Amino acid sequence: MVAFLAYGLLIFRLGFYWDELPITWIRYQLGSEALTRYFSTNRPVWGMLHQLTTRILPQVPAYWQIFAFLWRWLGAVVVYAIVARLWKGKPQSALGVALLFLVYPGFNQNSAAYLYSHFYIVLFFFLCSLLCMLQAMDSPKRYWAWTVAGILFSALNLWMMEYFYVLELVRVGVILVALRDESLTLRERIMRTLTLWLPYLGVFILSVLFRLFVFNNQVYGMGLTSQLKSAPIETLRKLAQSILFTLRLVLKDAWLQMLVLPDVADFRSVMNIYYLVIAAVILIATAGFLFMRRDELQTTRKNVIDASWIVGLGLLAVFLSGWPFWLIGFTPSLAWPANRFTLSFAFGVSLIFGGLIGLIPWEKLRIVLLVTLVSLAAGRQYLSARDYQQDWEIQKDLFWQMTWRAPGLKPNTLVLLNEGALDYYADNSLSSALNWIYAPDNHTDQIEYVLFYPTTRLKNALPELSTGIPIYYDYLAG
């Protein structure tokens, strides 16, 4: 119910956004081979996942919204199972971490359902690999069955995309947390950890070698390496600044934006629904905590130790989450579209917040804090979905106006459009919609129409504002 209130209220009024338009146009208009070419230069294995899902679902936004909703929810379910295993006897605390993960406010692009459903699937694979490993630790008779399943899920995560790539190394932290109560000497603990980690470490090393020597045609190269050679001190200083900025962003700023109210024309009607969402989440989350089996009473020292382990694991996860972006010189942001990078931090951040709240000795205060954070974050996600819904309506109105006022747009036409009216579309996004509308029977790799933002393309893909000049623009598929 919390997932539905955060993401499902506008599910049938949302559409395709940003990279979704060109990817779906390439797949459904130009065919599966064109989609293979599109992913050939970056994430080819992830492209296979797109091939599979697009064979199942048509180019209907509502289907993809439901699809993404289910994967987002399933990810939170797996997080609950992981934390419940690591934090034994604390089901309420595990629920709190799962809910924080579900509605993490740093990432607000859930409405781009086609695109991010495939992110959620890969994240689900990573989380399932951790859960399978924990199951293997608890089931000696089925150790290898669970381990093989965990290795498979881990490989799918590592081979498909880079967002959760370095986060794979948090596995050693998960093992240490799971073993914390076992009576082992230091040597036995190290050997036990290495034994459990070694199969997954082998898969990680193989994937690194694959990216280095087999498929090294990455769109974004690791510029940090060359920068370290040319200016090591300055590069390390900037890297440290980027890391600190990112940590503040995902741990503090992401949550503070929950308190920012929207500046919209129909403010009252929007806020009425917003307050209803928050109130409903408060009731549902409170009921969930109260009806769930209460956390076991433990000594203060045991509570502090267990919660501290969870916080430590979260800190490790957050630190590892940023390296796929820091290595290529990207810094996460809360602005669109760069807040997509915060998705990889959601697991670690939810562990940190859940662990810190778990340090509080008073159960009622813990529940109040968790419910407050979850309800405000769910309300923020609803407001984000509404922004996307409004942008979809403006985009549809734009092309309705075009087909009404310029029904006979000739092939090989360049359309120039001022920026500012649309928040969640780039000009190459709109180019695909333009071709879908004006050239519905064109299934070749020759694109008949292109839409440019002059401020973005002038002096680049668009040499000058003149008629009859050749324009070369590549969609990778056409």
Name each region found by the language model:
Residues M1-E448, T455-T456, A461-G478:
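Polytopic membrane enzymes that build or remodel cell-surface glycoconjugates and lipids
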